[in-house]
Amino acid sequence: MQSNTDSSGTSGTYSQTVGLLYVFNLIVGTGALALPKAFQSAGWLLSISLLTFSAFMSYVAATFVIEALSVANAVLSKKRRVEYDDVVVADGPSTFEIAKKVEVSEMASMFLSKVSLVFSYFAIIIYLFGDLAIYSTTVPKSAMNIVCSTINATIVKSSDPCHESWPEILTRMTVYRFFVIVFVVVVCLPMVIAGITKTRHIQIMTTLSRWAAFILMISLATMQLSSQGAAAHPPAYNFHGFGSLFGCAVYAFMCHHSIPSLITPMRTKENVFGKIAVVYGIVGVFYFTLSLTGAFAFEHVQDIYTLNFLHDDNTSLVYSIIDYFLALFPIITLTSSYPIIALTLINNFKVVKDILCPKTGQENESLLEADNQVEDNDTDDEREARNGNPKTIFDVLVPTLVLALPTFLSLLTDDMLLLASITGSFPGVAVQFAIPCLLVTAARKHARSVLNFPVPRKNNSPFQSRFWIMLISSWAGFSMIMVLLNLVGVKF
């Protein structure tokens, strides 16, 4: 897909401040809802240390993606000059200007070997599967807790009845599973079939609701701490909670797959590395405030933090409205995002099939087509009809698998913290750390050997030494081992 932004004009562009705000909104997603529980489980000092280091590693990887993006633009610039026999303009710093959006998948196709390319696609696919499982768990669990009796009074079990007056068969888990089926089959399946994606109005609505929800949660927890004192006293560190904390930390700083879509339209990229570092710092402070207030304000933090604000019946009307708004917040935001992730996942399967079993004349698609899905009005059926390609059993099995597997995982467990930690720890590590390292290593080599010009200092990541790539790789490997040991029950 081609970008709507013309490289020579300003159509579709925005100021650097707006672009940085988009980056902030992209990072601060619903993954933050699992952080307070992870903070309380792992301890406040370990949580602050790990989240700080994870944020720094995530920032380093983000600069790698931006540097690879500049090299990709130089490759396209050289290709255009060759096509038009423009031998006057030589390779130079200006060719590395980020003027055209090149998705992560396109950069992978430019720079990586077939093995690394397939690895990148599979990493994204597994990560998106985890994303869908988190979505199809968070929404039904929020709905179940709205319908069932409040969870703040006592610690409840999934086997407890939804209401004391209801039949025993209608346990909280039964009601939760009912909402899983309703959410996937009744709500999401029609949107996926119809190819419905997020519109600008829905994007504005979800952004406003996200800001309102996070500000309300921080304010309410702070008020509770100031009036009632700390309800819980988390330890400074608890290494047994390392696994869930690390996975949530990776998941909370995930933005790398969408960096090209946000950086390219900026009218100026002056000092972009430094300003993105400021964004990461602000996000870190925001996460610390949200997580620490929640970890100390509530005796038992829920894995979906918004559920802690479902008060007893004796609260005022204003508090009740706020509480139910917070409980509905994940339902509103995730329902609008589910079809985008599902359609992106379906497209990724098709791309992997084309890589492994190539067809003559088959058009390559982007690895992450969330933005392109909005711009492309043709459905898959219309494209296939135009190209004369009838539906195959693969075209039927893939959408079925995309919806069925995450739904099955959600039916097995309602532990969103577990799903977020696994998704962030394994495929998330590949998406956030491994793929950027592979891209920047190959892009730097391509710039020296093929373009015969080093990446200009303006477009260079501040982390040029191979030490940083080795550090990220070592950190990712160590963390994955720690997570695996925690999952199998090894005590520290």
Swiss-Prot record:
GO cellular component assignments = membrane
Query: What keywords are assigned to this protein?
Result: Glycoprotein, Membrane, Transmembrane, Transmembrane helix
Compositionally biased tracts (Acidic residues): 367-382
Q: Which family does it belong to?
A: Belongs to the TMEM104 family.
Q: Cite the InterPro entries for this sequence.
A: AA_transpt_TM
Where do transmembrane segments lie in this chain? 19-39, 46-66, 115-135, 178-198, 211-231, 239-259, 276-296, 326-346, 392-412, 416-436, 467-487
**Region span, Disordered:** 367-387
Give residue spans on the Cytoplasmic membrane side.
1-18, 67-114, 199-210, 260-275, 347-391, 437-466
Q: Which residues are glycosylated?
A: N152, N314
The identity of this protein, by name, is: Transmembrane protein 104 homolog
